[in-house]
Amino acid sequence: MKKGQIKSGGILLLTAIIWGIAFVAQSVGMDYVGPFTFNCVRFFIGGIVLIPCIAILKKWNGTEGESNKEDLRTLWIGGICCGIALAAASCLQQIGIMHTTVGKAGFITACYILLVPVFGLFFHKKCGILVWIGVLMAVAGLYFLCINENLMIGKGDIFVFLCAIVFAIHILVIDHFSSKADGVKMSCIQFFVSGILCLVPTLVLEHPHMAQLLAAWQPILYAGVLSCGVAYTLQIIGQKGMNPTVASLILSLESVISVLAGILILHQTPTSREVLGCILMFTAILLAQLPTPSKKSRQ
């Protein structure tokens, strides 16, 4: 492996670590503020953090030219569509985390990796055999992870699974606009759009006080600065020149790190049944990202 690829791999691993630990920040934040308040503030922070990142990445990529009106229109439409999906997915996730462990939330959220190619069938995108094997394993993993001995599923797990469905839609929206608009600029817009959308239920339903926000400043700042702003920028830099399959495999470690973070920081020890579910889920995620034999032969 080349030196540049090792560096990129390290950057992507750091991204996965930041995102994995973010589940802990999201859980701790719920001790002080409501889910809409948490998301509202962190998205505004993430958008603000990305503003200087846009200038830095312009110099990094050597792109200083101005965009035409059509490009700007596509950028704004993409940012707004992504922002709507991100707000919906994140609020579902945040509500779910209130009622489940961070490890389970991390693995259930990671289902979007399997759902994206399945949803892609509606857009005439074919799925390889490994994806379908992964889907079957994921269903088995979800059974052990979410359904207890009494055949009951937790309310939090349902919300997080719904979040995974919306995150899959979010990825498809990004995929549609990513080739037509600057990724970091679009992400900056989506964060502000998500923040505005979360502001309405924040003011109507939660009525946060400054004392609550100050008490939750550490998890909110982590989620806003590191998870939204820094990690996204690191992902863009890390994926440059890196094989997409390898990149996605490294980033999928986020789910494993969320479990470890839950154990080490929150002392949330998974049951043997949940561990089996996590193993099946992670194997399914890996399978879904591996190239099929037919793809290799064409390469």
Language-model features and meaning:
Residues 1-40, 83-84, 88, 92, ...:
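Glycine-/small-residue-enriched transmembrane alpha-helix faces in small-molecule transporters
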Residues 20, 24, 83, 87, ...:
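Hydrophobic/small/kink-forming positions within alpha-helical transmembrane segments
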Residues 22-23, 55-109, 144, 224-242:
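Specific transmembrane alpha-helical segments of multi-pass solute transporters/efflux pumps
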Residues 39-41, 105-111, 174-195, 228-264:
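Helix-helix packing/entry segments at the starts of transmembrane helices
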Residues 43, 51, 59, 216, ...:
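C-terminal-most transmembrane helix of multi-pass membrane proteins
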Residues 49, 54, 112-133, 256-275:
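C-terminal transmembrane-helix exit sites in multi-pass transporters
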Residues 50, 127-147, 167, 198, ...:
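Hydrophobic transmembrane alpha-helices of multi-pass small-molecule transport proteins
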Residues 50, 116-117, 152-206, 234:
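Transmembrane alpha-helical segments that form core, pore/gating elements
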